[in-house]
Amino acid sequence: MATLYIVRHGQASFLAENYDLLSPMGEAQSRLLGQYWSSRRLRFDRVCAGPRVRHKDTVKLVHAAYEAAGLDLPEVQTVPEFDEYPAEAVMKFGLPILLDLDTRVRDLHAAFLHSAEPKERQATFQRLFEIVIAKWAHGGLHLEGVETWPEFCSRVNAGLDQFLSAGGTAAIFTSGGPTAVALQRALDLSAQRTLEASWMVRNSSWSEFLYSAK
């Protein structure tokens, strides 16, 4: 049996102008992950990352921790199939549609705009985000030119098929969505459970799978 580690990136810059950058906390989380793995002498045959800055910067900080410990990490491949689902596009184009149709969305959006306390603002946005993304995932939002949920899952699974075919101990640095698709693949989760899992995966955590290479 071979082993796969799927890592969610360190904390990104939530509600900042550029979400894709690691926050100072995200950088610290990534360093700690690298220090922990290197302290356990965990070695990989292959490592890849999704295409986002937050994916690549997380693995760079893990790599730096390995170098500091005198250990090697394989050259990192960038695999576009392990990008996150198109959350930004869904929110940009889907939210205005739901603001016209759903009272609950309008109320949450108003509460978000008027909330001054950071934790309250973050919690309100998360509830709003989950409603809009769930509507899209279940086919309730048809957004021209935006990847659908089934297309997203197919993309990630195609990446997994290709990356896992070589076997060995492998690591993928990605986001919560692709991690959840791997969980769906292993546990036969429903679409709703898969979506919920994508929101539960913690920053810089890893999910570990045993698999048979094809």
Feature map (PLM): residue ranges:
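Loop-to-helix element that buttresses phosphate recognition and phosphoryl-transfer chemistry
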Residues: T3, G10-A64, E147-C153
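Generic beta-sheet signal
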Residues: L4, F163, G168-T174
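Active-site metal-binding loops of divalent metal-dependent hydrolases
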Residues: G10, G176-G177
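Short aromatic-enriched loop/helix-cap "lid" or pocket-rim segments at secondary-structure transitions
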Residues: N18-Y19, A87-F93, Q184-R185
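Phosphate-coordination/substrate-recognition cap region in phosphate-metabolizing enzymes
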Residues: Q35-Q126
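Alpha-helix capping/helix-boundary segments
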Residues: R54, P178-T179
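Alpha-helix-centered segments that form part of catalytic cores
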Residues: L113-A158
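Domain-level recognition of soluble alpha/beta enzyme cores
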Residues: S190-A213
